[in-house]
Amino acid sequence: MSKSSKDLLEFWEDQMKLSHTSSNYFFRKSPSHYHMMLIVMNSYKLNENLSVEELKTRLFKTSRPKSALMIKEACDKDFFYLEKTGNDHRKKYVLPTQNFINEFNEYLKTLKNLSF
């Protein structure tokens, strides 16, 4: 097995060990969960406001009720939180929690260090 393949395998096995103690399990439940994580983190990194309604619309192949449930679960598990800003208090924005931001950045740093 090549070194890069071995590194990737070790990385994956380490991630699976964390699966029940971190966001790994939640965001790997389905492609839609992973897609939701990427949308929220991309908006956060670009400093863009992402409303709950916009997130529901952008999650392809996921019904609006299922999208709402996924967002609620992510908030309940303290990965995301909802914030009301501006004059329209009916509009809620989805933001990652600081703990999740730290976890996500650590995940990206580890991925970048893998050589292929």
Task: Please report, for each region that a protein language model flagged, where it lies by residue.
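Short alpha-helical segments that sit at the start of domains
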Residues: L8-I39
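Short, cationic-aromatic polyanion-contact patches
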Residues: T85-L108
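Amphipathic alpha-helical dimerization/coiled-coil segments
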Residues: S19, N105-F116
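General nucleic-acid-binding
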Residues: M1-D7
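A short, conserved structural fragment
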Residues: C75-T85
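Short helix-to-turn junction characteristic of helix-turn-helix DNA-binding domains
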Residues: V40-Y44
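Short acidic, hydrophobic short linear motifs in intrinsically disordered regions
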Residues: L46-R58
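Short amphipathic alpha-helical interaction segments
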Residues: K61-D76
